[in-house]
Curated annotation (Swiss-Prot):
Gene that encodes the chain: eno
Protein name: Enolase
Residues holding Mg(2+): D239, E282, D308
Pathway: Carbohydrate degradation; glycolysis; pyruvate from D-glyceraldehyde 3-phosphate: step 4/5
Molecular-function annotations in GO: magnesium ion binding; phosphopyruvate hydratase activity
SMART domains: Enolase_C, Enolase_N
Keyword Magnesium: yes
Amino acid sequence: MMNGFSIANVQGYEIIDSRGNLTVRARVTLESGIRATGDAPSGASKGTREAVELRDKDGSVKGAVDSINYYISPALMGLDVREQGKIDRIMIELDGTENKSRLGANATIATSIAVAKTASISMGLEPFMYIGGARTHTLPVPLLNILNGGLHAGNMLKIQEFMVIPVKFDTLKEALIASTKIYKTLKSLVTERYGKIYTALGDEGGISPPLSVTEDALKLVHEAIKRSGMEGRVFMGMDAAASDFYNPEKGVYEIDNTSKSPDEMIEFYVDIASRYPLLYLEDPFEENDFSRYSELQSRIKNVIVTGDDLFTTNVRYLRKGIEMKSARGVIVKANQIGTLTETIQFFDLAKDNSIKTVVSHRSGETEDSFIADLAVGLNSDFIKTGAPSRGERTSKYNRLLEIENEFGLEYLGRRL
């Protein structure tokens, strides 16, 4: 029976992301006329176990758009938009593959997000309230990627992200103001040493100076923290994205103009953690090396070793990581698995096992701020959404500030 919550139509179409690539937008319209959209982000550094992003040979996403218009829309017509789990299960069954390779995870996640946003509007709820239900909501700590390397930049750094983490602050606003001060200080440092031309931004809004050695990047970020007067309040983080510089034929990591064995990489990270205020380390090894993750985490207990490519937002791999005690943290990327329902199942499994959670963007983003609501709705410990620059990044931070201003939620920084 049709009612005001019934889905009348789902339309897919192509839009442009922050890297100038085409991506998928889905728009869900209800019989009542209420409608909302969801966008599919896209990563540059991808785990091999991620759900499949359908992309045509010419770079378009027409195949994924067709999946929405010719398969997903008819299957969802007439369903109650509030039944997120049922809708996501229908898309999973309609796809029929383990990795969303028939419909495309970019088609299913765009639709899943659009369904959630439309449902929240129809119920008169903020998206984070709709997602989280009765959970007590808090504001996550941002991991701000202020210096870019790896596949996100045009320099020779192998480590992909160098982050600042504003912990010892009472509000998110204070934390972000401190972070923007550090970001501007870093820009000034790079200008002083290399010239203004080298303050060009990477894919995620971070600065990309002409560096090739990890230590030089760490020194720059640490000096920016100290010059800003934030030492002891703001910590450091890295996303190595180590699968991208691992040579499987030789079994070595090609970094800093040399080759390191997996055991040498452990000592490399242990040394960094002993000399810098390192709180967070993501993807330190290639995506299949669960045992080295475990060994490193046991060596640097105060650092949150975090798996992204290791787990790819998939409960099967997270269960393995839990069994092997591979990591204290997990990245949560909805497009890696393809529906919000599966994303939340992964998130809850991590939380149930006292693992820190990081709701994350991708390097190819849009201005859609949905992941800010997702992070707040799920009570994520952290959110990762780039530097405090570029509109597709600041839209998420500004949504968090809007939530803080309107609802007065607690900032998690001092609880970590």
